[in-house]
A protein has these predicted regions:
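Formylglycine-dependent sulfatase
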Residues: 16-21, 29-461, 469-470
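N-terminal secretory signal peptides that target proteins for export/translocation
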Residues: 1-11
Length: 472
């Protein structure tokens, strides 16, 4: 190789200056080329989070009275997870676990409802933003709670808000935020060189509902519901309440469909990891806020045209929402140790993306942990109802640490850990029923033993087996 030598090319100040100027001029070009290459290699991330939906109420396994074609398409063109669980079954604690990849008992105040976010915890969105991603959210991010920087400015744990575009929703109870239009504004705000991570946090189907909207505006029928779950009275008001819940889920799905269409139009769909799930179970008695199957078991579907091998698979591995943050970091090529994030407990799902099989892909994913610390106020001294649980293929074990307390809040303050609803009213009215309907109240609001053990049954059979049949 011909080597330049000092004898043939004597150094001079002018030569060095020229070389430095040339190097400096070329650096922006090299940097842009590297950024463009990184953007091509790193996928976009669209995280779609419904507010209060139980499995199997979105996707291919949803009942006939809930139509979610866009979630179904995500699953059929990607992966459907049959055993996905929330680590904590309330809005803010579950979202904190999603953002950090940590269980709620590892999150300090962030494990609570209506909390202050501790400064020591960074979110995966913040980590991606610090490593070149364009980040933003529309709708509900981490909430309810307060997250601020040291100077008092708001801290956007789910990304900068995009909420200026509004619409006339189907009911007055739904949010006026036009989620899909705000997603378009977010995309328009991004540079061509940047991958993006967007959080679509719908406020639906969180309560309250416009009573009867599912029938009047959604064209639904009460008799389409094959059977009401066994821990609620089977009344017209309960069935109407369920149809209103379904109508709001379908609105979430339509907004998601518009977002997917936007990605397709812009040629970004296959380079986008689309993840669809909910933060916790449906806002009904014995579900949301409680440590039970319907509260923790969530729909989960993913699509990534460029990254998921053998799409259309159905996965039976036990996964937790805390697995999402490490998954997002890995596909983005971000090492958690190079971020402000604390160590994560969740495990990346990319091994499932690359697998050739369906069903149980990883035999080590045979259990998940759930629990809670403190949810809504209402007990003396603002006490919580701490609990832990473990879910396996066959059993769901729950440890209630304060069984002397009311699990859904005390009667004196109206059982505040259960949202007001026609179903809640029906359950409370059943308390004085002389024909044995008091059991509905006991299942939803009564005190519980220190330990509970349930046999896990196929979801299709849950309604037929009943609650009592599951208790060992």
């Amino acid at each position: 190789m011909h080597r330049r030598t000092p004898e043939r090319f004597p150094p001079s100040a002018a030569w060095l200056t020229a070389a430095l100027l040339l190097w400096a001029a070329l650096q922006p070009l090299a940097t842009r080329a590297q950024d463009a290459s990184a953007a091509e290699e790193r996928p976009n991330i669209l995280f779609a989070l419904a507010d209060d939906v139980s499995f199997p109420h979105m996707g291919p396994r949803s009942p006939e009275w809930i139509e979610t074609p866009h979630v179904t398409r995500v699953a059929r063109e990607g992966l459907l997870f049959n055993r996905a669980y929330a680590p904590n079954n309330k809005c803010a604690p579950s979202r904190a676990a999603i953002l950090t990849g940590r269980n709620s008992w590892q999150l300090g105040a962030a494990a609570n409802h209506w909390a202050y976010w501790p400064d020591r915890f960074a979110s995966y969105v913040e980590a991606l933003g610090a490593h070149g991603y364009h980040t933003g959210h529309t709708g509900k991010g981490w909430a309810p709670g307060i997250a601020k920087k040291e100077n008092g400015d708001p801290r956007y744990l789910a990304g900068v808000p995009f909420e200026e575009r509004t619409t006339d929703p189907p009911t007055d109870a739904m949010s006026e935020i036009d989620y899909a239009a705000n997603f378009r504004a977010f995309l328009d705000d991004a540079s061509d060189e940047q991958p993006f991570a967007f959080w679509y946090g719908a406020y639906e189907p969180h309560r309250g509902y416009e009573y009867g909207s599912g029938i009047r505006k959604g064209g639904k029928r009460r008799d389409a519901i094959e059977q009401v779950l066994p821990f609620w009275p089977d009344t017209d008001s309960v069935r109407t309440d369920l149809l209103d819940y379904a109508f709001e889920i379908e609105y979430f799905d339509r907004q998601l469909g518009r977002m997917i269409d936007l990605l397709r139009q812009r040629g970004e769909l296959d380079n986008t990891l689309v993840v669809v799930t909910a933060d916790n179970g449906m806002p009904f008695p014995r579900v949301k806020g409680q440590t039970y199957e319907r509260a923790a078991h969530l729909p989960l579907a993913m699509r990534w045209g460029n990254g998921i091998e053998h799409p259309g698979r159905v996965i039976e591995d036990h996964v937790s929402l805390i697995d999402l943050a490490p998954t997002f970091l890995e596909v983005a090529g971000v090492n958690r140790e190079n971020t402000r994030m604390k160590p994560v407990t969740g495990r990346s799902l990319t091994g499932i993306f690359n697998a050739e099989t369906e069903g149980q892909v990883n035999p080590d994913r045979n259990r998940v942990l759930v629990g809670k610390e403190h949810h809504d106020v209402g007990r003396p001294d603002d006490a919580g109802y701490p609990a832990r649980g473990i879910i396996t293929d066959d059993y769901f074990y729950v440890r209630n640490f304060k069984p002397d307390r009311w699990p859904a809040g005390p009667p004196q303050t109206g059982y505040l850990n259960v949202d007001g609803s026609p179903t809640k009213t029906a359950v409370l009215d059943a308390r004085t029923d002389p024909d044995g309907a008091r059991r509905f109240w006991e299942w939803s609001f009564g005190k519980r033993p220190p330990e509970e053990l349930f046999r896990q049954v196929l979801v299709e059979h849950v309604a037929r087996r009943g609650v009592a049949a599951q208790l060992l």
